[in-house]
């Protein structure tokens, strides 16, 4: 199944390829997969700030993906605890806890079930500071949500709902691509003075493995990273899709096409300047994400780059995304934006 999705079943590694990008020392690191890196970040967050709390469905038992393993045993059930299956209640409680000056780290078991909490996130968390004239805020709220395809999840356990929240001023939306990024970005989200939705690519929980520093570190939000330099076309993505795009870049290189690959990391607010500079250099842009193409965040990136780089473009902006259908089960390989689809789009854009 993974091969059909254009993804390798082998353990993935994520070398730092960018020139001049912010690097995190791995001198004291050890190999971790993505869920272990997140678990380490949560241990650090609870250990360094006694006002921090972790809660959600089954988190006291370690969570369905084991991201909260050992937290309740170490920090006690007053700071790490289970909740009923009520997403709007979970987020609502987190908002109240954060409004009292605490760090509320909320887990939504699957991003597909975040929709019952939509009103709490959009009309309460995102507007808390604005509607009080900055007298009150719930900036200590971080919402963790596993998202995206996993090969067998179907339409209730595979969705990518990030675009819904990118239309909401007052919150931040962050998605990591690797274990090292996940730890540093999650700690930044927890300590950021604004509410954050942190989507975790669940396909990478066990597949992605790399050296992760054991110490406390943060990676800046709203700073994209050029993880592969090139001259012919710019590719922009986030999360697990970057591994697929990297494979397409390698195949394109064999055909003489030089691809520049950018990890957006933060979707709201996103780093327009890094993408703009790259597109002005290459003259071409391809965006890829798992979410359906219509109304996906790729459309926002496309519109912005057209406004900023119109006279520099050598070809129309290309989008390789999920199909405009409910997420299928047996037809998932046809729904997904695979390596071959991306490679075809790269070639057609470069040869436009």
Swiss-Prot record:
Thiamine diphosphate binds at residue 113. Its cofactor is thiamine diphosphate. GO terms for molecular function: 3-methyl-2-oxobutanoate dehydrogenase (2-methylpropanoyl-transferring) activity; metal ion binding. It catalyses: N(6)-[(R)-lipoyl]-L-lysyl-[protein] + 3-methyl-2-oxobutanoate + H(+) = N(6)-[(R)-S(8)-2-methylpropanoyldihydrolipoyl]-L-lysyl-[protein] + CO2. CDD domains: TPP_PYR_E1-PDHc-beta_like. The branched-chain alpha-keto dehydrogenase complex catalyzes the overall conversion of alpha-keto acids to acyl-CoA and CO(2). It contains multiple copies of three enzymatic components: branched-chain alpha-keto acid decarboxylase (E1), lipoamide acyltransferase (E2) and lipoamide dehydrogenase (E3). This is 2-oxoisovalerate dehydrogenase subunit beta 1, mitochondrial. The lineage of its organism: Eukaryota, Viridiplantae, Streptophyta, Embryophyta, Tracheophyta. The gene is BCDH BETA1.
């Amino acid at each position: 199944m993974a091969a059909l999705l254009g993804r390798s079943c082998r353990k993935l590694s994520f070398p730092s390829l960018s020139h001049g990008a912010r690097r995190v020392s791995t001198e004291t690191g050890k190999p971790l997969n993505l869920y272990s890196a997140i678990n380490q970040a949560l241990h650090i967050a609870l250990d360094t700030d006694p006002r921090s709390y972790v809660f959600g469905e089954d988190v006291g038992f370690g969570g369905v993906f084991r991201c909260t393993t050992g937290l309740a045993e170490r920090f006690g059930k007053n700071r790490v605890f289970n909740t009923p299956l009520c997403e709007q209640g979970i987020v609502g409680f987190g908002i109240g806890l954060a409004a009292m000056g605490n760090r509320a780290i909320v887990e939504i078991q699957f991003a597909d079930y975040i929709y019952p909490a939509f009103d709490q996130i959009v009309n309460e968390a995102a507007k808390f500071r604005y509607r009080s004239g900055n007298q009150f805020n719930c900036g200590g709220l971080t919402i963790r949500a596993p998202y995206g395809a996993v090969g067998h999840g179907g339409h209730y356990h595979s969705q990518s709902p990030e675009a819904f929240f990118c239309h909401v001023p007052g919150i931040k939306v962050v998605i990591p691509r690797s274990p090292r990024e996940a730890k540093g970005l999650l700690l930044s989200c927890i300590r950021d003075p604004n509410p954050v939705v942190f989507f975790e690519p669940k396909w990478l929980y066990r597949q992605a493995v790399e050296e992760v520093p054991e110490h406390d570190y943060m990676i800046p939000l709203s700073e994209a990273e050029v993880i592969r330099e090139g001259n012919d076309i710019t590719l922009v993505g986030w999360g697990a899709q970057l591994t697929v795009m990297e494979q397409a870049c390698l195949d394109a290189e064999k055909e003489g096409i030089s691809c520049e690959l950018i990890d957006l990391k933060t979707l709201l607010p996103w780093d327009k300047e890094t993408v703009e500079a790259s597109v002005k250099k290459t003259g071409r842009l391809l965006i890829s994400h798992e979410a359906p193409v219509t109304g996906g965040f790729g459309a926002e990136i496309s519109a912005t780059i057209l406004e900023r780089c119109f006279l520099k473009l050598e070809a129309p902006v290309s989008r390789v995304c999920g199909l405009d259908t409910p997420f299928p089960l047996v037809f998932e390989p046809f729904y997904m934006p695979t390596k071959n689809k991306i490679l075809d789009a790269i070639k057609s854009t470069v040869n436009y």
